Amino acid sequence: AVLAEGKISEIHTRFPPEPNGYLHIGRAKAIWINWGTAKKYNGLFNLRYDDTNPVKEDDEYVQAIEEDLRWLGAEPNGGIFYGSDYFDKCYEYAEKLIMEGKAYVDDLTRDEMREYRGADAGKPSRPSPWRDRTPEENLDLFRRMRAGEFQEGEKTLRAKIDLASPNMNMRDPAIYRIKYAEHHRQGSKWCIYPMYDFAHPIQDAIEGITHSMCSLEFENHRPLYNWVIENIFGTAFPKQREFARLNMTNTVMSKRYLRELVEMGIVDGWDDPRMPTLCGLRRRGYTPTSIFTFVREAGISKSDNLIDMRQLEACIRSELDLTAQRRIAVLDPVKLIVDNYPEDKTEYFDVANNPNREANDTTTRKVAFTKELWIENEDFAEVPPPKFKRLTIGGEVRLMGAYIVKCTGVEKNTDGSIAAIHCTADLETGNGNPADGRKVKGTIHWVSAAHAVDAEVRLYDKLFTEANMNAIPEGSDYKDYLNPESVVVCKGCKLEESLKDAKPGEKFQFVRTGFFTPDSKNPGVYNRVVTLRDSFKPAK
């Protein structure tokens, strides 16, 4: 509306992450809203690192955040900025407020300030004994704060607003504090730092942001945001707007918890495929399209909601069903010997890369067939359960894309385990059904033993057993809810020959098994992106 009415010439948004951790999927919602809004209206989108707190920030996170944005395709066409670049301006504006009698240096401790503001049990506020210092005295004290003459917590600069306000954020909030810490960009230049609620609107205004969109917990901060804009710039823009955070089942979004999982070695780094981080989802095999589809389906609202992670899985499953080429992988192999097939013969069958009609993929690949094959252990049963349609002694199955075979017996190891299964092939069925018209109900996948590629396959599942980790009993340890089967490692897997050249980032459907991608850190390892199917019905 403001664009159509001519109040602004273009939409300008920003994404302001604090570089103290890796971005998770909840932050993808903020990126989608801010970047997506700017893109929709041909506007500008900034990436701004909110690095006003010197204690927690690190260049490692700066680089990771930028990599995540570029991977998502959310190009910051308005530029990349740092909140710390505006420290001089923030200080200048703080002095302006002091001289106008709108800010004062307070000697109350943090706990005393909380008591005076009436933060406990909704008590009425009362003015600090130092609220009525003169502008000249406040300016002198503030400059001495900057010069390092006081200890941390000894002095604080507060905005003078409204102690009677029902909104705690308006009861003379702190806008500068003393902090002796090395800043990742500014070094030791500063020993006083602006509070987020003071720095954020200033940064937005300087960059020309028109719409400052943030999560719902900042809704009560909006009056303070507007107060800073009006009292420093005297303008009507930027405008702050809020949206509910995105929460997902069976995981945690708290940076503190995620950091603990990494530091305690419970997960394999921030990019562990079980983590809700964007780098973890990328390593798992999720795509930017699937993540933004999930965020869009979750919707924008002003009420917090918990989204089933299976909805995210449904998004990537739908995408990969169309885009992923099919390959054959045997995760728990047992040898199948075709006794009536020549020892020295190799035959190649043409197999469709993606039989899904909607994929419009008519390409095929050559798959080698030899006397000795690998099949899945679970596709054979000496004593089959009811309705078992796979291979049994005396029974027939179709080897997917190749011959019908009949099991004639098994070889066993001394411990009773199966060493090899023997069968004969109906060599007239390589290109179709048997001549006598008999029906074979079961079809199983296989890999030529002579051409197989060895691999490790990791089957990932939800990280926590509890769906709503925000609702666990107070005082309980979130780590008690870790899923002991969040990853199952399958070693000694046998993959078809074409996968020897597969690269990280490529996605495949292992037929009858799931969707997989090569791990970006460990050659010869494949990560399960998602299972082939699920009973979950995504929201429309």
Ranges and model annotations:
Residues 8-9, 103, 151, 168, ...:
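Intrinsically disordered or highly flexible coil/loop and linker segments, enriched in small
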Residues 218-222, 226-228, 292, 296-299, ...:
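Core subunits and conserved enzymes of cellular information-processing
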Residues 61-88, 93-94, 101-104:
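A glycine-rich helix N-cap at a beta->alpha junction
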Residues 4-66, 182-215:
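N-terminal catalytic cores of NTP/NDP-binding nucleotidyl/phosphoryl-transfer enzymes
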Residues 51-53, 59, 96-258, 316, ...:
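Active-site cores that bind ATP or allylic diphosphates and position pyrophosphate for catalysis
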Residues 238-315, 319:
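Long, charged, mostly alpha-helical binding arms that flank functional sites
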Residues 17-19, 48-56, 79-88, 111-112, ...:
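Conserved short loop/turn motifs at secondary-structure junctions
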Residues 4-7, 36-44, 70-77, 205, ...:
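Secondary-structure transition/capping motifs at alpha-helix termini
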